[in-house]
């Protein structure tokens, strides 16, 4: 089976600085990966490889069977969904209109484009999936951060992606909104069983229960990679974040806290 994503020994340098140093990652259909690491670890750069928008300095990147540099990237990108909570709109679109922009891959409704009745129906189905049916006609500025996050998930799904990328999707959310968004992500394991996903975060509490695998990085290098329940542990997280922590796991969710000896008294 061809992997959804196959990154082999990639490096990336910018302005003489080594940002990524020999990372490899293979993602299969239906797997849900967490990309964990501290600020400045190289997570955003690595996600750029996954999205087929950033070229490595050395190494190879295969996305959906196509190798970057040897295939039409615009075709690949149509099958990649991207959820970014910093998504900016120029116009006050409704929830439904925002979701429909996922078809055209534009920030706003594309000029001279009108969605078909089938596309509008599909948008409404996805809006219902993320629990926002009552807000379908609400305009973007009136939405809470949590509602915006769930709208962007629906937007990413409308093009039926094979790979879903989530760039710190719970940024700026309170606890209730975070939990609602994570519950939404967990439902995708059932509604889109073949879709693979990669979620970027530096907080273990933001990992949904559907997480199957994890890649922990630090200073552009791999600390650990594999099944989430095997690699998201006290040893690896402490190494990745260069700080002694205790990792907990209960009811399918992870947590992290400082070791007692490292707390400031």
Where are these regions (language model features)?
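The feature captures the beta-strand-to-loop junction immediately N-terminal to the Walker
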Residues: 36-38
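Conserved ABC transporter NBD signature motif
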Residues: 59-68
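ABC ATPase NBD coupling module
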Residues: 67-81, 109-116
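Conserved ABC ATPase signature
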Residues: 139-143
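Conserved catalytic motifs of ABC-family nucleotide-binding domains
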Residues: 160
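Catalytic Walker B motif of ABC-type/P-loop ATPase nucleotide-binding domains
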Residues: 164-168
């Amino acid at each position: 089976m061809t992997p959804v994503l196959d990154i082999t020994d990639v490096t990336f340098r910018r302005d003489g600085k080594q940002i990524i140093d020999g990372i490899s990652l293979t993602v299969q259909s239906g797997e849900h990966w967490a990309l964990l690491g501290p600020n400045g670890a190289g997570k955003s750069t690595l996600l750029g490889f996954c999205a087929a928008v950033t070229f490595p300095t050395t190494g190879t990147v295969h996305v959906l069977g196509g190798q970057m540099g040897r295939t039409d990237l615009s075709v690949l990108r149509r099958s990649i969904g991207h959820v970014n909570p910093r998504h900016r709109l120029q116009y006050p679109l409704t929830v439904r209109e925002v979701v429909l922009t996922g078809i055209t891959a534009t920030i706003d409704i594309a000029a001279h484009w009108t969605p078909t009745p089938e596309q509008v129906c599909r948008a409404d189905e996805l809006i219902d999936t993320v629990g926002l049916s009552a807000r379908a006609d609400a305009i973007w500025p009136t939405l809470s951060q949590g509602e915006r996050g769930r709208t962007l998930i629906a937007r990413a799904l409308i093009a039926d992606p094979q790979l879903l990328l989530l760039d710190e999707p719970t940024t700026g959310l309170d606890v209730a909104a975070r939990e609602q968004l994570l519950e939404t992500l967990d439902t995708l394991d059932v509604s889109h069983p073949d879709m693979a996903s990669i979620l970027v975060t530096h907080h273990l509490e933001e990992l949904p229960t559907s997480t199957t695998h994890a890649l922990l990085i630090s200073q552009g290098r791999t600390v650990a990679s594999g099944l989430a329940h095997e690699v998201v542990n006290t040893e690896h997280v402490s190494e990745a974040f260069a700080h002694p922590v205790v990792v907990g796991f209960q009811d399918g969710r992870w947590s992290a806290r400082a070791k007692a000896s490292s707390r400031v008294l």
